[in-house]
């Protein structure tokens, strides 16, 4: 069998924040990808603003470096299971993976998720123990943990014989010896070339190119990114696109782009083993195969994990609608959601009975909150409902998504965390005492039990706990309520501006969400009640002026700091009868029915119907 020894295709996989993107930066720099005078941002592979801010990778990225006589195509993959749709498809495009594990933290839930995907594709990993220079680094123990994980995930004998490289990505060093570092990343380059198989060279056979990722460009339209599995593809070539429904469409390849560093470079042809981007077909989709017109031979369709969580997106109809956003109409919001579907194959958008609302389904809270955050930054205004898990019927049994949860917590908080997990129908799988005052707890918990849990967890552990979770499987649905918010809320009784005097008057009733000067409206949630019922309050109350005392005295009032919630915290906080109003400038919580009397009528009606 003829091989392309001048080429290697690898994916870099890891848990969030284990230094994967920084490692790729070093590989790019040390291979001489950038000119000496070229200004390159830190974490160059994270191109999206949100990726840079959060330090996570959301979209899979392609890059290529030349080391000696070998070209190495590198795919930097998302480390979060919410973007698992991307991870799975990338595994089809590569011949090996580099698994990055933190020298202190060891194996984490997302490490398990991405590694499982790689092993399922029979890929042989190269293990990189990163951050070897960290205090309390424990490389030998971490390698034992990795081996245990491989065995647990049914790795074959060849996969269990993985090579190990010890690295400090931030310092740009790597070595085969955990006790001393070389001066550069050469040990990693050499290990990749030695242990990752070269692609098969069958460029003379009929073409097979499969689309794994999508991109969109205003000039050339939709772009399919994938791998040439067989044959050669040339610019101007007339080919057939084998659609997912079995039909074929003919089109002409207008442009082929290869990858060099962080840039796409136009090329005239791509051969077996190459990873390229192709334009020319407007309705190209993930999983479809490009073949010669006279030799239609599609590859097996790529399987993509189904969504597990859904939310309703609604046109903003609050009293402040249209004030802060640029795009506020149903048409604009629908166009934006449809354009997201062009590149995000794990997303689903379904219409509802109302022309102003859509059910949007995704892989998890992070997946959907990233979409909402991007929309608000682009100038959209909308409202979203409480996230709900998607229930499936499997063999006639109602099943719900279950997650694997890993919690690292100081010993003194283990009791309260275990109790709170039990209340959310969590089952303990393992408990590991590291002997340094920290305990690792592993649970399986229904996904609906985790909605809204982050805030409770932070307060239980006083900010010292670390919570990670990833989708595990669908299991028969457990009876009864799981999780949810226990407290009621403080609801504004009228439109106005919050005042120090008004806030001070209700501080003892709960936690306040607004600061003095914040504009509020009737039905807007302005705080959390100490009790389990909702309470209507007046936060815009003014101190009465008299001859003796003027209203300016109000300025001396001292009040507690308001709790300002992020978008994710706001989404987690919601109940069924509430919306999160999202605009470019504000995130507000509100009741779906703004008027108190109408809310009470609706509650009575629901009770009468036997639904409460």
From Swiss-Prot:
Q: What Gene3D superfamilies does the record point to?
A: 3.30.70.240, bipa protein (2.40.50.250), Elongation Factor G (Translational Gtpase), domain 3 (3.30.70.870), P-loop containing nucleotide triphosphate hydrolases (3.40.50.300), Translation factors (2.40.30.10)
Q: What induces it?
A: 3-fold induction by growth at 15 degrees Celsius.
- Per the UniProt record, one Pfam family is BipA_C
The disruption phenotype is: No visible growth phenotype at 15 degrees Celsius.
Q: Where in the cell?
A: Cytoplasm
Q: Which residues bind GTP?
A: 17-22, 130-133
Molecular function terms from GO? GTP binding; GTPase activity; ribosome binding; rRNA binding; tRNA binding
Q: Which UniProt keywords apply?
A: Cytoplasm, GTP-binding, Hydrolase, Nucleotide-binding, Ribosome biogenesis, RNA-binding, rRNA-binding, tRNA-binding
Residue span, tr-type G domain: 5-200
Q: Which reaction does it catalyse?
A: GTP + H2O = GDP + phosphate + H(+)
Its GO CC terms are:
cytosol; ribonucleoprotein complex
A biological-process GO annotation? ribosomal large subunit assembly
* Protein EC: 3.6.5.-
* HAMAP family in alphabetical order: BipA
Family membership noted in the UniProt record: Belongs to the TRAFAC class translation factor GTPase superfamily. Classic translation factor GTPase family. BipA subfamily.
| Assembly | Monomer.
Q: What does this protein do?
A: A 50S ribosomal subunit assembly protein with GTPase activity, required for 50S subunit assembly at low temperatures, may also play a role in translation. Binds GTP and analogs. Binds the 70S ribosome between the 30S and 50S subunits, in a similar position as ribosome-bound EF-G; it contacts a number of ribosomal proteins, both rRNAs and the A-site tRNA.
- The molecule here is called Large ribosomal subunit assembly factor BipA
From which source organism is this entry?
A: Bacillus subtilis (strain 168)
Starting at the broadest rank, the lineage of the source organism is:
Bacteria, Bacillati, Bacillota, Bacilli, Bacillales
- What gene does the UniProt entry assign to this protein? bipA
